[in-house]
Amino acid sequence: MRLHEYQAKQVFADAGIPTPASQLAETVDEAVDAAEEIGYPVAIKAQVHVGGRGKAGGIKLVESKEEAREAAEDIIGMDLKGYHVSKVLVEEAVDFVNELYVGVTMDRGEGRPVAMVSTKGGVNIEEVAEEDPDAIAREHIDPAFGMHPFQARKVVYEAGVDREVANDVASVLTTLYQLWDDRDGADTEINPLMITSDDEVIAADAVMNVDGDALFRQPEIAEMGEEAAEGDELEQKADEYGFDYVRLDGNVGIIGNGAGLVMTTLDLVDYYDGEPANFLDVGGGAKADRIANALDMVFSDENVDSVVFNIFGGITRGDEVANGINQALEQFDEIPKPVTVRLAGTNAEEGMEILNEDLVTVEHTLEDAVQRAVEYAKEVEA
């Protein structure tokens, strides 16, 4: 479960990490009043779970009351990559001389958490990791003992952080790890951690993903989660239907039964140069209505250009899946997005006979199904 920026910053601030002065606003007037109280210049930032908010018009720097009103009117109520913006964070603009990245996540290959620091902050850290992996210093942590101060200092110095602020950055990293551990974090990061001309460190952004299966022991975070889901109609719909759903940034919609099967499909979409739009696990024993709901939901994502079903029947029967797909598609005069289906396992042959091949493309192997779905998505892009 991912918290909004304003929620993550509150958690960070409560733990002692410096953050800019800010106020949450739900209306234009509230945003203007907040800007006046904080003092210009301020940043007005859409509170939605998407990357690249600035490039998409979801973050604006303003220097006057008139600019604040205009920016708030533009951002509040806008659709940002499929997310409805209902709240903005009005935040003090930080005058900085340098930007860093600091983060803690789980290295599943090593089976241990890893702390990361880079002097290439303020940009997409995934791109940095791909293009210049040596620009990110890493330190694995033994969860039995936690992060020692010397480890924090070591990774900060290895990243090339200036000595004048190295101890403060190490302190922030140590706190970030403690939050990751105490709050059952999946990812915690600050990008950018800004360095001012006075050698102060300030968390200008905040990301906190929490293990959803651990929310029973994180009541405060769970309460935040109800608010964090607001504004994303697809995630709300997934909760209503009882689907395990994660929205991604690509254009190939993915529906499967079982987390491992869906993850494999995501990996194959990426392998064949496609971009997954979502993770959607309908669960075991899915009936026709449930399959139809899943397809309707993925269709409603405007970023999706093609859909692939990957179903391996155990208690989920192929004929039920086929009936659900037909049920969902027969309501349309024209199929809005191409659908590719791969069925295997229980009643798979019956299911393939039931499927209306005028409405879907049937493939007999997962590789063929994924390649076809990626091709369809690329045809739409072209």
From Swiss-Prot:
Gene Ontology annotations of biological process type: succinyl-CoA metabolic process; tricarboxylic acid cycle
Family indicated by similarity: Belongs to the succinate/malate CoA ligase beta subunit family.
Protein name: Succinate--CoA ligase [ADP-forming] subunit beta
Keyword Nucleotide-binding: yes
Keyword match ATP-binding: yes
UniProt xrefs under NCBIfam families: PRK00696.1, sucCoAbeta
The protein's Enzyme Commission number: 6.2.1.5
Gene Ontology molecular function, alphabetical: ATP binding; magnesium ion binding; succinate-CoA ligase (ADP-forming) activity; succinate-CoA ligase (GDP-forming) activity
Domain of life where this protein originates: Archaea
Keywords, in A-Z order: ATP-binding, Ligase, Magnesium, Metal-binding, Nucleotide-binding, Tricarboxylic acid cycle
Pathway terms, separated by semicolons: Carbohydrate metabolism; tricarboxylic acid cycle; succinate from succinyl-CoA (ligase route): step 1/1
HAMAP family for the chain: Succ_CoA_beta (MF_00558)
UniProt GO cellular component terms: succinate-CoA ligase complex
Annotated binding of ATP, by residue: K45, G52, R53, G54, E91, V94, E99
Annotated signal peptide: none
Cofactor annotation remark: Binds 1 Mg(2+) ion per subunit.
Chain's gene name: sucC
